[in-house]
Amino acid sequence: MSDRGQAFTLEAITASLLLIGGLVFALQATAVTPLSASTSSQHIENQQQAAAEGVLTTGLDDGSLRRALLYWNDSANDGSGGFHDAREEGYYVDKTPANAFGRSLNRTFTSRNIVVNVYVYYEEAGREKQQRMVYRGEPSDNAVSASTTVTLYEGARLYAEDGSPATTTITNDTFYAPNATSGGSYNTLRVELIAWRQ
């Protein structure tokens, strides 16, 4: 009986060594990482996408996006102005607008080294035209975008540099987007926000 017990013990030890050896081999043969590079990158892009959509939705809900669209300086009254305190191109290159929408962009993106471009699309003579609001360069391959629409109505007033409503109303001569409709609405603007990591 003792020979049989020794054989069973030897057999059990051999089986356990084979099992442990197989597990060690399997673990060494496969890489065990929490996220691969592409999965991690996709996760970051998903976060940026959600943030871009959130900024636009919040701006639409609290009115800051509409006010930013109307934050236009046309002191020459010829339609060729630009956003307040922007460079000579008429749009922001090295900063964001000095209003609630600009602060939201800074808080959400700029403070995290994420670059944004903001484009405003509008209809003119049946064709879509573009006005840059913020332009920081060409987006990278991993850029995300979100967009929303804002309808402006006839009689809407531009906003002064201090953020207060100005006396000037939007017309073809005072605003970048022309009156493209009739019946009370002035033009429907599509705002696109593109974000990418520097």
Residue map of PLM features:
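Long, compositionally biased, intrinsically disordered regions
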Residues: 27-198
